[in-house]
């Protein structure tokens, strides 16, 4: 049986990021063979990763990446915010965004895409095994234009292109690319701050608009307004609602006078040198729609100490 030295354990630990005792056991189980020990730990780590897959992953990072006329935004979740500050996890998010930029926004295709000798899904599993938390590629979206730019903005960035919120905005134009890109970034910042639900009223969910209309009408009926006036009052109310939730009608955050985004874009055409059309936007906020697990402090202490 081969002698397991401290140097061998140190090398294996640095290679895999696994704890010292596990590394020592891996080398002992594989007669000091470093490559076999790595495989042994991978198998053990993957087994641990499978057990962690049932945990809620509601933290993590949003990644946004653009390349001229196309861009992607992704959400990769972890269990704790601590992992989001881990360099390996941050690198994983950037890598997945780069893959998504090539293969598109289909999560299954991204997971199956080759990365080195493995796949994106394999890289995620390796990270789970090394870092010790459940992780998942939750969602992805992409925008592309034939002419123009797709710009991005990341809010709360921990590294370039990854943070707590990510936005991509697609602008179609034959104008100056640099000017267009600057406008696109400003619009992406606006989307992050104002959280529009659609580009214009036509893009809103008809059921949502219908519900707004009904709520307004009932409100004015209860106030005793005449039926022949309610329709007009509701229409005016909907115009106000559209200014709150439709990007082109929102007050532009970069304009002190509060002109509408649509008007600001129209005025920017002179600087860009060509007509500009906003094709679409995507805004991802970390963990939105995920129900986080909570526990009281006493339960957490009991869990750590092994009590029931």
UniProtKB/Swiss-Prot annotation:
Residues 80-83 are annotated as: Involved in Mg(2+) ion dislocation from EF-Tu. GO terms for cellular component: cytoplasm. Keywords: Cytoplasm, Elongation factor, Protein biosynthesis. It is found in: Cytoplasm. InterPro entries: EF-Ts_dimer_sf (IPR036402), Transl_elong_EFTs/EF1B (IPR001816), Transl_elong_EFTs/EF1B_dimer (IPR014039), Transl_elong_Ts_CS (IPR018101), UBA-like_sf (IPR009060). It comes from the Bacteria. GO terms for molecular function: translation elongation factor activity. Its main location: cytoplasm. Associates with the EF-Tu.GDP complex and induces the exchange of GDP to GTP. It remains bound to the aminoacyl-tRNA.EF-Tu.GTP complex up to the GTP hydrolysis stage on the ribosome. NCBIfam families: tsf. Belongs to the EF-Ts family. HAMAP family: EF_Ts (MF_00050). This is Elongation factor Ts. It comes from Rhodopseudomonas palustris (strain HaA2).
């Amino acid at each position: 049986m081969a002698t397991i030295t401290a140097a061998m354990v140190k090398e294996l630990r640095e290679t895999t990021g696994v704890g010292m005792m596990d590394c020592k056991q891996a080398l002992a189980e594989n007669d000091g063979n470093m490559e076999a020990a790595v495989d042994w730990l991978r198998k053990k780590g993957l087994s641990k990763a499978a057990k962690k897959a049932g945990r809620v992953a509601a933290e993590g990072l949003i990644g946004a990446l653009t390349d001229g006329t196309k861009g992607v935004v992704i959400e990769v979740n972890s269990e704790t915010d601590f992992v989001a500050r881990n360099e390996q996890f941050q690198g994983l998010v950037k890598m997945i965004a780069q893959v998504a930029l090539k293969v598109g926004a289909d999560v299954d295709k991204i997971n199956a895409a080759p990365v080195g000798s493995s796949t994106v899904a394999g890289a995620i599993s390796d990270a789970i095994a090394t870092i010790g938390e459940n992780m998942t590629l939750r969602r992805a979206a992409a925008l592309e234009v034939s002419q123009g730019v797709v710009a991005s903005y990341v809010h709360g960035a921990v590294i370039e292109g990854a943070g707590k919120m990510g936005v991509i905005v697609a602008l179609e134009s034959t104008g100056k690319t640099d000017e267009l890109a600057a406008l696109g970034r400003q619009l992406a910042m606006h989307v992050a701050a104002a959280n529009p639900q659609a580009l214009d009223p036509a893009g809103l969910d008809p059921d949502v608009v219908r519900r707004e209309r009904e709520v307004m009408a009932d409100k004015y009926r209860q106030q005793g307004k005449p039926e022949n006036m309610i329709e007009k009052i509701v229409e005016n109310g909907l115009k106000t609602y559209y200014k709150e939730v439709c990007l082109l009608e929102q007050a532009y955050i970069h304009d002190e006078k509060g002109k509408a985004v649509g008007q600001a874009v129209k005025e920017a055409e002179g600087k860009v040198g060509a007509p500009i059309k906003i094709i679409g936007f995507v805004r991802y906020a970390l963990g939105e729609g995920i129900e986080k697990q909570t526990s009281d402090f006493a339960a957490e202490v009991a869990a750590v100490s092994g009590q029931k």
